[in-house]
A protein has these predicted regions:
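Class I S-adenosyl-L-methionine
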Residues: 5, 123-211
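Rossmann-like AdoMet
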Residues: 1-67, 71-122, 127
Length: 211
């Protein structure tokens, strides 16, 4: 399978993926991000959201979409800071992991969805607001290329069926990368291909009519 598909399964598989099996951010979790340090980060974000709302002319129905919201730590901090933009607006937490969604806060204009595609946006009538994410793009699945004999080739992952390999999976080198990569292929070097991050940015931008 492509390396990107393997990373996707390791992180987000609904049965055995990292997040579905208890992996999380926080002081008692596996890693720490700014929202878990304390409420100050959320207060700063709330002020920035108000600045964006003001710049748009204080529209009613201002919508804040937080992708990869986890258990809602940032949402809690932002809401506690009482930003003016949310007095008549809404804050939508987008989180693909059902285990994390169950721990999110509710009420006070907060709602939750599993994906950006689940937002009720009609074609030609996008949201007015902000789509944001904290440390998401560097946590999306990515492809991997390796330079072999002057050519970038795709790194694949397969099941290790022979008894001499102690790991259940192993990497193999596949076909030449397509489209070609504009980086000199120094023998043995590797580079990530983050096409998923680009797709996410395009999808996020498509949600907004202004913001």
């Amino acid at each position: 399978m492509p390396f990107e598909a393997w990373v996707e399964a390791c992180l987000y598989d609904p049965d055995g993926g990292f997040y579905a099996t208890g992996g999380s951010a926080g002081r008692r979790g596996d890693f720490l991000t700014s929202p878990e340090v304390g409420p100050l980060f959320g207060a700063v974000v709330a002020r920035w959201l108000d600045d964006r709302w003001e710049a748009l002319g204080r529209p009613s129905g201002f919508t804040v979409v937080e992708a990869a919201a986890g258990v809602g730590t940032l949402a809690r901090s932002v809401r506690s800071a009482l930003p003016a933009c949310l007095e008549a607006g809404r804050y939508v937490m987008v989180e693909r992991c059902a285990v994390l969604r169950k721990a999110q806060p509710t009420g006070d204009g907060l709602s939750s969805l599993p994906g950006l595609e689940d937002l009720p946006v009609r074609e030609g009538d996008g949201l007015v607001g902000v789509v944001m994410a904290n440390e998401l793009l560097d946590n999306l699945a990515f492809g991997l290329l390796e330079a072999v004999d002057g050519v970038w080739r795709e790194v694949l992952v397969e099941l290790a069926t022979d008894s001499v390999d102690p790991q259940p999976f192993r990497e193999v080198i596949g076909d030449a990368a397509h489209p070609p990569v504009g980086v000199d292929p120094l023998q043995g070097s590797r580079i990530p291909v983050q096409a998923g991050a680009g797709r996410w940015v395009d999808d996020a931008r498509a949600l907004l009519s202004a913001g």
